[in-house]
Amino acid sequence: MGIEYSASSITVLEGLEAVRKRPGMYIGSTGPNGLHHLVYEVVDNCIDEAMAGYCDRITVVLEQGNVVRVEDNGRGIPVDVHPHEGVSALEVVLTKLHAGGKFDKKSYKVSGGLHGVGVSVVNALSLWVEVTVYRDGAEYYQKFNVGMPLAPVEKRGVSEKRGTIIRWQADPSIFKETVAYDFDVLLTRLRELAFLNSTVVIQLRDERLATAKQVEFAFEGGIRHFVSYLNRGKSVVPERPLYIEGSKSDVLVEVALQYHDGYTENVQSFVNDINTREGGTHLEGFKSALTRVANDFLKKSPKLAKKIEREEKLVGEDVRAGLTVVLSVKIPEPQFEGQTKTKLGNSEVRGIVDSLVGERLTLYFEQNPGVLTKILEKSIAEAQARLAARRAKEAARRKSGMDSFGLPGKLADCSLKDPAKCEVYIVEGDSAGGSAKKGRDSKTQAILPLWGKMLNVEKTRLDKVLHNEKLQPIIATLGTGVGKDFDLTRIRYHKVIIMADADVDGSHIRTLLLTFFFRYLPQIIEAGYVYLAMPPLYRIAWSKKELYVYSDTERDEALESIGKKSGVAVQRYKGLGEMDGTQLWETTMNPVRRKMMQVVLSDAVEADRVFSTLMGEDVEPRRKFIEENAIYARLDV
């Protein structure tokens, strides 16, 4: 806390020249994700101040005209003259790429992003940036246009405040798709940061509306509160999430975990507040410790051990069934790898997390035998189901001479084999499936009709999912496998299209299928492969003409446009089976004319809550959710 933070703390690595030419290299894209990344970069700097112990309040404001303001009460960016650059440190941080106080590890031991990179990239990709700094009893101001300072830092007077305010307007010539920020997208990330940093209050305010909208996050319980938030509305063990904290060799480890009454695991892992969606060595260490400790205690419990076959052990997926865990690691030099650079590669972290978690879990279970017994019983039940599923699969393979997940007989496959050019329609019922088969382009479009009883996977363990008469054909058709066997590179179609009727039953089937994809195949949603077909609600025919419309509003507008002509006929489609192959092709399957909705997972935490509410056991939260959201539904009752 006593180390001086001044201009000499700022290390400069290179200039800004390339940023405007190749912005995607610095912020990932110039679409909506890249636009929001500007905010994250600035907020990350505030979080770095908080992690260093100097900031406890961060405010993000969306102003009129797509202007963003981010304010913190940290030490303020240094404004004294930089020893090597000859201008103020503030100007260096805003105009030099890789200039910041993070590189010498003195001003900041740990940082969630590269301080200086973020601010300078925001400056390079904005029409203008204004910075106000409060430090050393004074207020300082500097403005930049397209990355260049308009004047040196100006001292504006005396102030007792402390901190930094950064305002900017993103450049629409860079962000051609949109420069409008999405409140909910920012809310998701800021809520996550507040959970991960329990000492900080984070406020998000939207002043673009007639009445300003504001949320404030403050979670003194930190990641323990995060786990409770993820598990709300569920029956849980233990009642209060188990919390583990410790450090070794400058690696700080925090874990909070709790089991719920479902069967899917919910693992959220972070390194320096960065969401490591692809996992990494920290997560490997946690999983290894949890499985080892569970098996160690099982050996000491002969009564429980008898419940699984001799020579069999609990495996990771048994022990993690129904587990919600948040793992947060903070390290000085993270090495990221993987497709999206969200996988931790530091080999030393695995052992540190493994030993710390193993030691603390052992101590906790020794002191809480009741909790241990409940967790072991759940894990054993999962192991029994897994072994039963394996035996059934092996028996089916011996009987048929092939893998029991061969392509289903009712699949009408397409002739092309390039997944990027192929799509599969998942259709409820043989009648709609028949129309779809007649109307499709057999070169690129496959049709999978579903039959039998649809399973609610929210209340079901994996062995039943794998052998359900409706879900097994989907798993076989997609080709990715499921669970530990999942491999996205084996997917056979890059468009998986759910096509169901527009009535209550169709909506229920869509929800059940989306629950299945979210719980067991979330990677294909994240890859952008899942879509909802939008069949028309009405066919309007008049004077040898016809028009298909997709909502009551479109119907009313069309009828008003047609006027009071005689012979206008309006047909309401109750189900897909009412359309013949040609009509289904023209309205719902023709890539040139069809309407589809891509299923996007922008907020996994909120998605988890919605699926748990809609498909879980507890009736009251479901009733409340339906009452609050009924206005948004489009159902034919």
Swiss-Prot record:
It catalyses: ATP-dependent breakage, passage and rejoining of double-stranded DNA. Binds two Mg(2+) per subunit. The magnesium ions form salt bridges with both the protein and the DNA. Can also accept other divalent metal cations, such as Mn(2+) or Ca(2+). One of its GO terms (biological process) is DNA-templated DNA replication. It holds the Pfam family DNA_gyraseB. Its EC number is 5.6.2.2. Keywords: ATP-binding, Cytoplasm, DNA-binding, Isomerase, Magnesium, Metal-binding, Nucleotide-binding, Topoisomerase. Residues 422-536 form the Toprim domain. Mg(2+) 2 binds at residues 501, 503. GO terms for cellular component: chromosome; cytoplasm. The keyword Cell inner membrane does not apply. Its main location: cytoplasm. The record marks 453, 456 as: Interaction with DNA. Transmembrane segments: none annotated. It comes from the Bacteria. Mg(2+) 1 binds at residues 428, 501. SMART domains: HATPase_c (SM00387), TOP2c (SM00433). It is an enzyme of class 5 (isomerase). The keyword Cell cycle does not apply. One of its GO terms (molecular function) is DNA topoisomerase type II (double strand cut, ATP-hydrolyzing) activity. Its cofactor is Mg(2+); Mn(2+); Ca(2+). A type II topoisomerase that negatively supercoils closed circular double-stranded (ds) DNA in an ATP-dependent manner to modulate DNA topology and maintain chromosomes in an underwound state. Negative supercoiling favors strand separation, and DNA replication, transcription, recombination and repair, all of which involve strand separation. Also able to catalyze the interconversion of other topological isomers of dsDNA rings, including catenanes and knotted rings. Type II topoisomerases break and join 2 DNA strands simultaneously in an ATP-dependent manner. Belongs to the type II topoisomerase GyrB family. This is DNA gyrase subunit B. The gene is gyrB.
